[in-house]
């Protein structure tokens, strides 16, 4: 195994966590906060915009099974990287599109992917995703972890997360953990 880590901010971490948990090669997904100016932020502080943190997921993945470029494609295709501080009805700097990298190679690959997607005109508007060095990661409160799987009957899961998972599954069937395919 070749375990690597990356932290993504691409909207509400409940949605993002649910998507990345289904990927083959992903060893762990932890919801949390990064990119702010205060230590140990709470969900309410982040939501109020008091800390400058983004809602993020911290991933550990086996790079022998899932490449960083594949992760980047999933990242860009499962949220709107062209809206500043917004994903759908979720508005605020905590929902910004961000890649928090740990190595210079990750930075270069992220910047190259943005250039490629821009050159290919994949999106109608410019990509506004931040590519920034990882800072301190703060794990979110326990009730945010594994949210979709623990709360499938909640309306947010049914009306927001499930449609995103369905769209993801259609485009990335070959990347889904085999045991999750029905």
Regions found by a protein language model. Give the residues of each.
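Flexible coil/turn and secondary-structure edge motifs
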Residues: 1-182
């Amino acid at each position: 195994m070749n375990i690597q880590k990356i932290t993504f901010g691409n909207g509400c971490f409940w949605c993002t966590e649910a998507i990345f948990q289904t990927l083959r090669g992903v060893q762990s997904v932890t919801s949390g906060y990064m990119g702010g100016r205060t230590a140990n932020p709470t969900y309410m502080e982040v939501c109020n915009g008091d800390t400058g943190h983004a809602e993020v997921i911290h991933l550990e993945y086996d790079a022998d099974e899932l490449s960083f470029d594949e992760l980047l494609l999933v990242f860009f295709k499962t949220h709107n990287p062209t809206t500043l501080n917004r994903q759908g009805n979720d508005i605020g700097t905590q929902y910004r599109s961000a890649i928090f990298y740990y190595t210079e190679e990750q930075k270069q690959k992220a910047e190259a992917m943005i250039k490629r997607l821009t050159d290919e005109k994949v999106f109608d508007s410019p990509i506004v995703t931040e590519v920034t060095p990882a800072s301190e990661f703060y794990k979110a409160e326990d009730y945010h972890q594994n949210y979709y799987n623990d709360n499938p009957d909640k309306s947010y899961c049914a009306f927001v997360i499930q449609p995103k998972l369905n769209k993801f599954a259609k485009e990335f069937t070959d990347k889904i953990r085999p045991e999750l395919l029905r």
